[in-house]
Amino acid sequence: ESFDDESAAAFRRWLVEKYGDVQAINRAWGTAFWSQTYRDIQEIQPPRAMPTFYNPGQMLDWRRFSDYALRSQMEREREVIRRYSDRPITTNFMGTFPLLDYRKWAPLCDIIADDSYPDPADPQAAHDIAWQGDVMRGLGDGAPWLLMEQSPGAVQWRPQNSPKRPGQFLLWTIARLAHGADGILQFQWRQSAKGSETFHAGMVPHSGEDSPIWTDVVSTGQALKSLAPITGT
C-alpha cells in the first residue's frame, strides 16, 4: 500500500468513477455517523493514522483500490512483454494474501504461481499447504500451477525461525505436487553472505554441501526425477 499524495489523488479518481460524486460516497460509507461527511472530493484521503476506529466502508474501498492499482500495473507490464515475447507470463501469488483479489489476477497469468513459507514448527502447516495448493489449482481452473518459492530450511523473518526437520523439505515438496503443482522452485540457491536475508536458508547454506540442508535438497531432486511422468496432471 502507498499513502502518498499521488496515490491519494488516484484513490479519489477511482472513487468518482465508482460512485459518481461525493454525495454517493457519503451514502455508501455512512459518513453521517460520527460527523464524517465530506463536502468535496478533495477532502477524502487514504485511511492514514486515525485517533480511533477506521470507517469500514472507506477501508474496504481503499483495499479494493489498492488491488486495482497493482493489478493495473501488471496489465501494463504484460502488454509490453507480449509485444516482444510469446513466453508464458505470471507473477508470484502469496497463498490467501488478504489484500489482493487473486480471482481477478488469475486471468492475467498464463500459469498460476505461488510463494509458500509455512512454519516448520506449526502442526497445522500440512493443512495450510494442502489448502493453499487447492486454491492455486482452483485459480487456474484445474490446470497445474508452479510453486515459485519455498525455503529449503529456516526463514529469517519470524520471531522464532525454526529449521525444517529431516525429510520435511521432501514431504512438503511432494505435498505440493499432490495438490497440483507442476514445478517446484526454491528461494534461494546459495545462502546470502550479507544483507537483509543473510539468515534465510539456501539450497547451499553457509556450511556448504556437507550439510543436512544440501543432503535434503539432493534427495528431493532425485525424488522429483522419479515423478516426472506425472507432469501435466
PLM region spans:
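Polysaccharide-binding and catalytic clefts of secreted carbohydrate-active enzymes
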Residues: 1-111, 115-131
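Carbohydrate-binding surfaces of carbohydrate-active enzymes
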Residues: 37-48, 75, 83, 95, ...
